[in-house]
Amino acid sequence: SELARPLTANKQLVAVLCRNDRFTLTADAATQLHGHAALMLDGSRPVGEQVDTLTAYRPDWIAGPPGTAEALAEAAAVRDRHELAGGELVSLSGSDAPMDPDLAVLLGTSGTTGSSKYVRLSAAAVMANAGSIAEYMGLTPVERPVTSLPLHYSFGLSVLNSHWLVGAAVVVSAESVIQKGFWEAVRRNGCTSLAGVPYTYQLLERVGYRELDLPALATMQQAGGALDRRLTATYHEHMQAKGGRLLVMYGQTEATARMAYVPPTRLSEKLGSAGRAIPRGELRVEEAEPDIAGRMVGEVVYEGPNVMLGYATGRDDLARGDELGGVLRTGDLGYLDEDGFLFLTGRSKRIAKVFGLRVNLDEIELLLREHGPAAAVAGDERVRGACAFGSEEELAQLRTALAQRLHVHPSAFELVRVEEIPVTSSGKVDYRAVERLLRSS
């Protein structure tokens, strides 16, 4: 392609400033097809704010929108600039540090927090995950998904890769699901599927999605965190009524994107489940102990060909090979039911101590979300909840109900009314921003 022409035969690191546009899709595809490695960055953030990442990884090239070279002038030594349709390819001083021949993609783990910790993915892992997704979804060349998620986010990128693998077209929209132009593009192009995280589904409720006339849209995908059971059931029933389906899935960037899914035919009976392992993957629970309900809860471990090579925090780490051997300790807690379906109960790191008791913050958050948008974080000897719903009286009643359910004093909880729950660019709860919001309230 025109974009790949300036790149040398030696393996190069290309930082892609990802936006939902054709240039980003071309940059990603050209980089990987020619054996180079793509560092996927959030293109909605000014490049000047990403200097720490660029300094840590010393990319050889940056593929970004028009004006990228100018924006970089003060932050990096620009050697050359190639104008292309929809963007530009900027040559930097780069690095002579070797890279693992298998390395294909670097994806961030931190949303918008600015961490330089990235997941190293091989081309084989990307292809394996795309193949598994295409298989369990039954994808064909007539599919036509729309870019409803950022492409620097593993879920958004996996939608692209899995559909490209079967020869399907992808409809590119830079607009949000709350904008009229997005739905006009969906209708005009006959889009067949829409992917979203829990926050996306909250926005869909806001725009009255279920009243929209979208006859071609037969598949909805949900991942990126637990969607509350009420909304899951609502969208499952809505899609069933129109002859479509809702696919609930579970994954991590460390496993390229997806590790489990709930077959739509089992969704009603397995409401709340993260699903069973994707084709060629295996889920198990290790170091399990009985919880209050007598369920054997332990750390979720995933094994499969889509597991990352390892982490990186800078350019020198890119020479490292496969450090995990296809086995990922997810850090998630959960249990498997008698049919092998996974139910998540929280994160091993999302545990708070309240009056000497261990309290699962994710469990609290799910209980709060039954009433509306919410997030839970740890405070001093209590759980603090940010709630974008309810009056002062209603929150006081909810606090009492939580205390009774968990057999603790109501003072173990502080629920604060907020305008909205802060989210990252990928639509997940931004817990650092939640903590700042609660400190200022």
Outline where the language-model segments fall.
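ATP-dependent adenylate-forming carboxylate-activation enzymes
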Residues: E2, C18-R19, L39-L54, P66-T68, ...
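Conserved AMP-binding/adenylate-forming
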Residues: E2-S44, S148-L149, R358
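AMP-binding/adenylate-forming catalytic core of the ANL superfamily
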Residues: V16, G304, L309-G310, G331-S411, ...
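Conserved pre-ATP/AMP-binding loop-to-beta segment of ANL
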Residues: E83-G108, G114-S115, G138-R144
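Conserved AMP-binding A3 loop
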Residues: A104-G131
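Conserved AMP-binding/adenylation subdomain of ANL enzymes
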Residues: M127-R144, H152-S193, I278
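Gly/Ser/Thr-rich phosphate-binding loop
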Residues: C191-G196, E205-E269, E282
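Conserved ATP/PPi-binding loop(s) of AMP-dependent carboxylate-activating enzymes
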Residues: R276-R280, P290-G321, V359
